[in-house]
Amino acid sequence: MANQPSIAERRTKVWEPYIRAKLGFRNHWYPVRLASEIAEGTPVPVKLLGEKILLNRVGGKVYAIQDRCLHRGVTLSDRVECYSKNTISCWYHGWTYRWDDGRLVDILTNPGSVQIGRRALKTFPVEEAKGLIFVYVGDGEPTPLIEDVPPGFLDENRAIHGQHRLVASNWRLGAENGFDAGHVLIHKNSILVKGNDIILPLGFAPGDPDQLTRSEVAAGKPKGVYDLLGEHSVPVFEGMIEGKPAIHGNIGSKRVAISISIWLPGVLKVEPWPDPELTQFEWYVPVDETSHLYFQTLGKVVTSKEAADSFEREFHEKWVGLALNGFNDDDIMARESMEPFYTDDRGWSEEILFEPDRAIIEWRGLASQHNRGIQEAR
């Protein structure tokens, strides 16, 4: 009798598209920079889903082109040379491309070349929303941005501020770390816990497995999973070792993180967080196979310019240090510590999951089934 596949092999087969997606999912929108970081006429290189991309703001509008000359493949951003507002010239042989459509319009070293007008760099759709620059890597016409951000992110009266940093782990470890309700133990000593007097247990003892998640997959809308562990479990505030109390959670005055959800292509929404009037939206943007851009934003509903200005000051003066760094630095440590275990893909079959991981399992399944394409290494 032939050897039967193990439970781990059968399980990972269900997630096979997710496991293949080391470089992320194609045909989706991703934030790559804050809008304020792309100044007029100042090209900025980024890497997204393994592709080198060059951004520039021309006449107020941001464009994105392939950061590689068609001639000999050198990286344009290694030495940026722009001799006109609307073009960039390769520093090696002077091939000159337009920012808006990537078209090769001149060659400084051979003005009569037959290649002029016949070639073009790859371009990428760009949208600027809520102070972020989103880039679409894919084929054909892009889907509406609203389908690739969590519900509520684009609400007209919601002000958004954020920051980003590079993390040395695959994007999926970032997504699963953020969506892992059972990992709150690592935050027990965070300055946010006492500094903002929040309620933070050590973990959760799950109830009925069938009530722990809810998925949203309607056509034309964002697709994601809600973690209902907080609603259908018993919070653990006292950690026991061999029958004796060892550590304790924090019973503060502020209840936060009531609703936690994750959405394609890899963005978490925690509401409210880190304060009852705030919502955290954070992306795990694939850079390459072993790193991701951790794009953290906080949103607040504001009804006046004064309120918007006050939130902006509060974001920079309080929440960056107390929450985005003071709390989430623990998450970065966990992701980078997991990376070696999953780098060669063996971790997906060797991991041993437990009851609170139900939401992660649902996320893997939803992402495998509803992504719009897998980015392959080029």
Swiss-Prot record:
<dbReference type="GO" id="GO:0018564">
    <property type="term" value="F:carbazole 1,9a-dioxygenase [NAD(P)H] activity"/>
</dbReference>
<comment type="function">
    <text>Part of the multicomponent carbazole 1,9a-dioxygenase (CARDO), that converts carbazole (CAR) into 2-aminobiphenyl-2,3-diol.</text>
</comment>
<comment type="subunit">
    <text>Homotrimer. Carbazole 1,9a-dioxygenase complex consists of a terminal oxygenase component CarAa, a ferredoxin reductase component fdr and a ferredoxin component CarAc.</text>
</comment>
<dbReference type="GO" id="GO:0046232">
    <property type="term" value="P:carbazole catabolic process"/>
</dbReference>
<keyword id="KW-0001">2Fe-2S</keyword>
<dbReference type="GO" id="GO:0051537">
    <property type="term" value="F:2 iron, 2 sulfur cluster binding"/>
</dbReference>
<keyword id="KW-0521">NADP</keyword>
<feature type="binding site">
    <location>
        <position position="69"/>
    </location>
    <ligand>
        <name>[2Fe-2S] cluster</name>
    </ligand>
</feature>
<keyword id="KW-0223">Dioxygenase</keyword>
<dbReference type="InterPro" id="IPR017941">
    <property type="entry name" value="Rieske_2Fe-2S"/>
</dbReference>
<keyword id="KW-0520">NAD</keyword>
<feature type="binding site">
    <location>
        <position position="71"/>
    </location>
    <ligand>
        <name>[2Fe-2S] cluster</name>
    </ligand>
</feature>
<protein>
    <recommendedName>
        <fullName>Carbazole 1,9a-dioxygenase, terminal oxygenase component CarAa</fullName>
        <ecNumber>1.14.12.22</ecNumber>
    </recommendedName>
</protein>
<feature type="binding site">
    <location>
        <position position="93"/>
    </location>
    <ligand>
        <name>[2Fe-2S] cluster</name>
    </ligand>
</feature>
<feature type="domain" description="Rieske">
    <location>
        <begin position="29"/>
        <end position="135"/>
    </location>
</feature>
<dbReference type="Pfam" id="PF00355">
    <property type="entry name" value="Rieske"/>
</dbReference>
<dbReference type="Pfam" id="PF11723">
    <property type="entry name" value="Aromatic_hydrox"/>
</dbReference>
<dbReference type="GO" id="GO:0046872">
    <property type="term" value="F:metal ion binding"/>
</dbReference>
<dbReference type="InterPro" id="IPR036922">
    <property type="entry name" value="Rieske_2Fe-2S_sf"/>
</dbReference>
<keyword id="KW-0408">Iron</keyword>
<dbReference type="InterPro" id="IPR050584">
    <property type="entry name" value="Cholesterol_7-desaturase"/>
</dbReference>
<dbReference type="InterPro" id="IPR021028">
    <property type="entry name" value="Homotrim_ring_OHase_catalytic"/>
</dbReference>
<keyword id="KW-0560">Oxidoreductase</keyword>
<keyword id="KW-0411">Iron-sulfur</keyword>
<keyword id="KW-0479">Metal-binding</keyword>
<feature type="binding site">
    <location>
        <position position="90"/>
    </location>
    <ligand>
        <name>[2Fe-2S] cluster</name>
    </ligand>
</feature>
